Amino acid sequence: MPYIDVFNGDADGICALHQLRLHNPQNSSLVTGVKRDNLLLKRIIATRDSTLTVLDISSHANRDSLLQLLKQGNTVHYFDHHFAGEIPESPLFHPHIDTSPDVCSSILVDRFLSAKYRLWAIVASFGDNLHVSAHELAGSLKLDPKKTEELRELGELINYNAYGETIDDLHFSPEVLFKALQPFSDPFEFYHASGELNQLREGFRNDMGKAESELPVRQTSAGRIYQFQNQAWCRRVSGVYSNQVAREAPDLAHALLVERKDGTFLVGVRAPISKPQGAEKLCIKFSGGGRAAAAGINNLAPEEVDRFFEAFDLQFTI
């Protein structure tokens, strides 16, 4: 039976799959994309009688495709922490779904594998801006601060690589980056040996240097909203910059609007770290989605921006 691995191109999706394939290697076909390219099941809608492993994309957003794939005799193993909606019922469907704000898909895989490759779950948790969870996992392994810091940087750099409107915006396609990880069961070996990581580190430094000169376009008691122009570096840095400003002001919500080539906006929302709730509720109102702590909108029309600002304030004003 053919194997197909479908995964979000961010650190969480890549590290979740890496853990599973270290445990159970397969000659799988890989299906992935940029961070926001999460309707990945549409790409394989004709698949029949295969084993699908799906990681870190919303089952709610992919529901129609998922139901069709189950009807076509595919066995589906699903690990995710985004808004799920109604969970399909099928003997072929094996869900591992937990939408709690302190977990990511790699933590769900870590649980499934009884912590066999926990170091990679720590990498993913840092990448997903779940620093408290990451430090708790690091504490369970008694990692020293230097090693924990290396895993933090690794997670944030892999995550940085996922953000863009298309693959052309990225330093590496997520498939290439995943394949670069595959020979390494130990993330510290990858950290010290990887040429890809050096390129990501340089790109990250350059892009963040530009982003840190930006000021909010709107600031209220609810939070801060930033707006970036239509340039590749703006798209690349959007996720890690959003995470950084969220950590700097943990009691505030944050949003970042990045202009797309068609004039609409790509929007990232971070709920306050001190109260990680409501991001997905806000974004669903604008045909977006995500999870309670962090969510997004793929195409916010310019005429909807003011309404988004008002809804943001309403959602996060205490």
Language-model region placement:
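Short N-terminal helix-initiation segments at or just after the protein's N-terminus
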Residues: 59, 162-174, 192-206, 236-242
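Loop-centered beta-sheet repeat module
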Residues: 134, 138-185
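Oxyanion-binding "anion nests"
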Residues: 96-100, 180-227
